[in-house]
Design a protein with these regions (language model features):
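Glycine-biased low-complexity/repetitive sequence motifs
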Residues: 1-202
Length: 202
């Protein structure tokens, strides 16, 4: 464009994390950042679109193997105000690479003494928040002996991931993924943005 543009709304969404196999946690959603009233320069703006975390597979009950993978960051490179959304956290598997569970939204956990909770969301922290934490695995782990673990759901832009629920040594439900976030159409800036005839819903 010729000259700067003011009052722009910019949505930046990062790549989501991948889930872990064999009862592991679900991957977290990529960071979600919607900023209104941005001023854009009259020049090309570099944009990086983050990829989702690579999928994984592996044999059952193999300690130390195959956690999920984090998603990659997305960047809107406005020189006046660069906006980065963090990749989603990986689903964890047997407590391996627990820090990879943190991200834009956190990955769900697979029970392990060092990772009882899902990964943190809004990591690194920004305001407004770019995501939510992942859900927990079933709290009792592999108790009684012979039972199995079930992963928590990955966090979403609009809600935390659900916790898993083990109802018997051989039955249960994994945690649901967290909800996404609605996006409204806004034109102009506060205090009186124009939402259009549908009140910003489409």
């Amino acid at each position: 464009p010729q000259g700067a543009t003011s009052g722009a709304s910019v949505l930046v969404v990062a790549g989501g994390g991948s889930g872990a196999p064999q009862g592991g946690g679900g991957g977290g959603a990529g960071g979600f950042r919607l900023l209104a009233c941005q001023t854009l320069p009259g020049s090309t703006i570099p944009v990086t679109i983050g990829a989702g975390g690579a999928g994984v597979g592996g044999p059952a009950h193999t300690p130390g193997e195959n956690p999920g993978n984090k998603g990659s960051n997305s960047v809107f490179g406005n020189p006046a105000n660069p906006i980065t959304s963090a990749g989603g956290g990986a689903g964890t598997f047997r407590g391996i690479c627990v820090s990879n569970g943190n991200g834009g939204s956190g990955g769900g956990s697979d029970y392990h003494p060092i990772s009882p909770s899902g990964g943190s969301g809004n990591n690194p922290p920004v305001s407004p928040s770019q995501g939510n934490p992942g859900g927990k695995s079933n709290a009792n782990g592999e108790t009684p002996v012979g039972s199995f673990t079930i992963g928590g759901g990955g966090g979403g832009a609009g809600a935390s991931g659900g916790d898993a629920n083990l109802t018997s040594p051989s039955k249960g439900t994994g945690g649901a993924g967290g909800n996404g976030s609605p996006v409204t159409s806004t034109f102009g800036c506060a205090p009186q943005p124009f939402y259009g005839p549908t009140n910003g819903v489409y």
